[in-house]
Amino acid sequence: MSNTQLLEVLGTETFDVQEDLFAFDTTDTTIVASNDDPDTRFKSWSLCTPGCARTGSFNSYCC
């Protein structure tokens, strides 16, 4: 079914749809500045109990 036929089935106003309507432009590039250090953007902390798999604590995997 062509794009125009699909528009007729949906009951909308028909018009000529080009085939490249849904084509994606893959030539865009992302430039990351040299001072954009990923270590400054992402931080994580972990809090572990001293149980170390002996207490059955939910975070005893930290050992």
UniProtKB/Swiss-Prot annotation:
| 2,3-didehydrobutyrine modified-residue sites | 55
An example of a GO molecular function for this protein is: signaling receptor binding
Q: Which parts of the chain are coiled coil?
A: none
Keywords (alphabetical) are:
Antibiotic, Antimicrobial, Bacteriocin, D-amino acid, Lantibiotic, Thioether bond
Say yes or no: keyword ATP-binding present: no
| A Pfam family it matches | Gallidermin
NCBIfam families for this protein: lantibio_gallid, mutacin
Function of the protein: Lanthionine-containing peptide antibiotic (lantibiotic) active on Gram-positive bacteria. The bactericidal activity of lantibiotics is based on depolarization of energized bacterial cytoplasmic membranes, initiated by the formation of aqueous transmembrane pores.
Instruction: List the protein's name.
Output: Lantibiotic mutacin-1140
The UniProt gene name for this protein comes to lanA
